[in-house]
Regions:
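Conserved donor-binding/catalytic core segment of Leloir-type glycosyltransferases
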Residues: 317-336, 342-345
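Nucleotide-activated donor-binding/catalytic signature segment of Leloir-type glycosyltransferases, i.e.
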Residues: 368-389
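A short, active-site helix/loop in glycosyltransferases that binds the activated sugar's phosphate group
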Residues: 274-302
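Short N-terminal targeting/anchoring amphipathic segment
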Residues: 206-212, 216-236
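Acidic anion/phosphate-binding donor-loop and adjacent secondary structure
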Residues: 260-264, 308-324
Length: 389
């Protein structure tokens, strides 16, 4: 079997996910993509990928939490006779509470007299709940959130520290209402998982110190000897290379392995474990050369495969709307080194140029506040713009 493992498959995505999907589509063989993050509505993303022709029918998808739930996480409820999808609807009125429309579509806030005690978000104009927040009357912050899938089934409960927006734990439920996983989170940094409990038949089955060990357990149970496994996420290098099956592990390096002249911490394990790696796929000859300057890895373990883009020949160019600007599109994460882009742009302006820099992306590591601080320090607020993507 040929697998690709990655942490996430977002609906809106940049370079890494785009390159992953194009590689798989180009090969057009029977692939299974395994993801290890939690998402209660993954089937809707798979459907969108197929509608947009990003994957072929040869591609299968599986999520780690789907497997942990014994494949009950994404089970679609059906009506008894026609077997059509069944939607659980929740009235928008709550007895004894005053409701007020929120700023977002489908968002309603509920008040006990003047005290905000609950909020609900519905999917569009339907009566299918997306989430429900329970609000502390003393702090005004939510202390608990219930999340529902597209059919209105509860799939997660999140719990928050008192007087804080930080989450301390969550509980994951299958479509039959059984809790199969409980996770605990650090307060710093970035609310990383620092404890996982797995339940079977309502009894504690296994525990893990973090989600890397959980991913290793998942891979150990899913792979067999001689499976071919592409890994596109550095977070999963250790779980993949520490599982004990004799798999052909192919590590795809989507960005630079260097931070200045030092090897990035996220790359060290993979590059130190070359005996367990079948191939490293790199972007450039220079990247291969740089890696071999630091690690004794043979030439035959490298394969050069640059990223590529598809040109849409049907789109007509409208020169009347051309804007003179640099554009970055991708994740706002530490590994992307957006600060380097901003500093390089600052040097560019010092040469007398006036082209603006526009940054499009999703904040993953709380980078936007740091970016805004740097932009202010360099007095670039009128030249650098940040947009959600």
């Amino acid at each position: 079997m040929i697998y690709t493992v990655t942490t996430t498959l977002p609906l809106s995505h940049g370079g890494r996910t785009q390159a992953l999907l194009r590689r798989i589509k180009l090969l057009d063989e029977e692939f299974k993509i395994l993801t290890t993050n939690y998402h209660g509505n993954y089937p809707s993303i798979y459907k969108k990928y197929r509608q947009e022709n990003k994957v072929t029918e040869n591609i299968q998808f599986e999520n780690m939490y789907e497997w942990l739930s014994n494949f009950k996480l994404f089970k679609v409820p059906k009506t008894l006779i026609t077997r059509n999808p069944k939607y659980i609807k929740t009235p928008r009125k709550i007895k004894g509470l005053i409701d007020k429309q929120g700023k977002k579509s489908g968002l309603i806030h509920y008040y006990n007299n003047e005290c905000h005690v609950r909020s609900r978000k519905y999917y569009g104009q339907s009566n299918v709940l997306e989430y429900e927040d329970f609000i502390s009357p003393t702090s005004g912050l939510k202390y608990e959130r219930h999340q529902y899938n597209l059919y209105g089934q509860l799939h997660r409960k999140e719990y928050y520290y008192d007087d804080s927006s930080l989450k301390h734990s969550d509980e994951l439920f299958d479509t039959e209402g059984s809790m199969y996983c409980k996770r605990y989170f650090k307060t710093k940094p970035n609310s990383k998982i620092n404890g996982v409990e797995i339940y079977r038949n309502k009894k504690l089955y296994k525990t893990f110190k973090n989600d890397k060990l959980l991913a290793q357990f998942y891979f150990q149970n899913r792979f067999k000897n001689q499976d071919i496994v592409f890994n596109d996420a550095r977070f999963l290098d250790k779980p993949l290379l520490k599982q004990t099956h004799q798999t052909k592990n192919i590590l795809v390096l989507h960005s630079s392995h260097l931070s200045g002249d030092q090897i990035k911490k996220s790359y060290r394990f993979a590059l130190n474990q070359s005996k367990n790696v079948y191939k490293y796929i790199v972007l450039t000859h220079q990247q291969k050369h740089d890696i071999q300057q630091h690690f004794h890895i043979s030439d035959d373990q490298f394969q050069l495969v640059p990223h590529f883009i598809e040109l849409d020949t049907e789109v007509e160019q409208d020169s009347s709307n051309n804007q003179n600007r640099f554009i970055y599109i991708g994740r706002f994460s530490t590994e992307k080194q957006i600060d380097h882009i901003i500093r390089a742009y600052h040097k560019f302006l010092q040469s007398g140029y006036q082209t603006e820099l526009h940054l499009f992306g999703r904040d993953e590591d709380n980078q936007i506040p740091l970016m805004n601080t740097l932009i202010s320090e360099l007095k670039l607020s009128d030249k650098v713009k940040i947009f959600k993507y």
